Design a protein with these regions (language model features):
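Conserved SAM/SAH-binding beta-strand->alpha-helix loop
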Residues: 52-53
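Conserved class I S-adenosyl-L-methionine
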Residues: 20-29
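Conserved S-adenosyl-L-methionine
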Residues: 39-45
Length: 93
């Protein structure tokens, strides 16, 4: 599935990510940015985090539908709590 981003803000963020990066999307909501980056081969892996369970459940559904569950992790957290133990070193968005 070829995924497109809904909006210029997400497109602008995606343009800044270098190929092969490991990205964390803080406040991911639907996980559109991680799905786009990993699905297009821009990022090698990603973490999609959110403080609320509802958005994270939507993100999980979207990630599964995109077939990227093995390369995009989910994290229920406030901000960056618990993130750095996952090895994300390239980009926090």
């Amino acid at each position: 599935m070829l995924f497109t981003l809904p909006g210029q803000r997400l497109e602008a963020a995606a343009e800044l990510v270098r190929p092969g990066a490991y990205v964390a999307d803080i406040g991911t909501d639907h996980a559109y940015l991680p799905i786009y980056l990993v699905g297009r081969g821009i990022a090698s892996r990603a973490v999609a985090s959110d403080i609320n369970r509802g958005p994270l459940e939507r993100a999980a559904s979207n990630i599964r539908a995109a077939g990227l569950s093995d390369r995009i992790s989910l994290l229920l957290t406030d901000g960056v709590d618990g993130l750095f133990g996952l090895g994300v070193t390239d980009y926090l968005i």
